[in-house]
Each structure stands twice: as C-alpha cells, then as structure tokens.
A protein has these predicted regions:
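Residues within well-ordered alpha helices
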Residues: 4, 59-61, 122-123, 133
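A general structural signal for alpha-helical elements within enzymatic catalytic domains
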Residues: 5-6, 84, 135-138
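Soluble, non-transmembrane catalytic domains of enzymes that act on hydrophobic metabolites at membranes
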Residues: 108-120, 126-132, 136-141
Length: 173
C-alpha cells in the first residue's frame, strides 16, 4: 500500500477491497472496492471499509480533518463525506487490503431480527446519523416529507449505480 500511495502523490485517501470475516473466523464474502463517488457515498451510504482505507496524514489529519465524535454509528460515513466535500482525492487501489470481522457486538450491526425497544431505538439513531449526513453534505428541502421522498429516490438511483459499478469494475485479488 505504501508503494502505491508513494506513486500517487495526488492521493489523500487510498482504499481497496476487504473480506467480511464471520464470528467463526471464516470468510463470509469478499467485498470489491468501487470507484469513489461523493454523491453515491452520501445517498447510498458508506461503501468503503475503514479497515481497507489509508489516509495521507499530511493532507487530512494534519490539516484538521478529524473524526466527529458526535457520530456513534456512522462516524466513518460522516468523515468520508466531509473529506469528499472538502475536495480530498480518494484513490482506488484495486487490491484486497484487509479483513473486517463481523460479529453481533459491532456497534453498527443490524438488529433486524430483534423487535424490542432497545433494537428499535438503535435503528432510529443509526437512521438519524445517516439523515444528518444527507442534509448537511447532500441536498435538503425545507419540507421534511420532500426530503424523505428524495432520500428514497436517490438511494435507489445510487443502489443501481453501485450494482452497475460492481459488475463493470475489474478486480484483482
């Protein structure tokens, strides 16, 4: 990764593919890294893994771009949106770079099966952070109902774009 980053001095962020690892230590699936799109990131959601993403300290952290600790579920998503909005260059390194262990204790792990107040409050807090990213870094209408319609439309549009990119982006493991 260092050699690639050194060969790309224009890169503020270098990222690549990763594996999801289950609680049993087995690979559940490999995740292909796709070209970065700020709008796809805002409207679809975070699709870059922090475990497979490297920051150039001199053009990010040392310039004051730090994590916003007010976010608990989508801290990476807000950070990447802020870096993208600031014009930082995300460079796709088309290699498998990391593993991400998925287990029930992950803060952002979904609680789809659970139907209790704690699980529902957690889901709503996650959605609230996602909505804040859309309102601050994306578009916003004064009518909340218009934002909901736009959010649904834009998410589906970028979900289709992501599917297209997944099919057409080459991948070297």
């Amino acid at each position: 990764v260092k050699a690639f980053a050194d060969s790309r001095p224009d890169a503020d962020i270098v990222y690549g593919a990763w594996n999801f690892i289950g609680p049993d230590g087995e690979i559940q699936r490999a995740m292909k890294a796709l070209p970065y799109s700020l709008n796809m990131h805002i409207w679809y959601g975070t699709y870059l893994a922090s475990t497979a993403l490297f920051l150039r300290r001199s053009t990010t952290i040392e310039e004051g771009f730090l994590l916003d600790e007010r976010f608990h579920y989508d801290m990476d998503g807000e950070y990447y949106a802020r870096l993208g909005r600031a014009g930082k260059k995300f460079v796709h390194y088309n290699r498998l770079l990391a593993d991400f262990r998925w287990h029930g204790d992950n803060l952002s792990a979904p609680n789809i099966e659970r139907r209790d107040m704690d699980a529902e409050l957690k889901r709503q807090k996650q959605h609230g952070e996602d909505a804040a990213i859309k309102r601050i870094y994306g578009l916003s209408f004064s009518k909340h109902s218009c934002n909901n319609i736009m959010d649904g439309f834009m998410r589906e549009a970028y979900r289709m774009k992501k599917a297209f990119l997944y099919l057409t982006t080459p991948w070297e493991k």
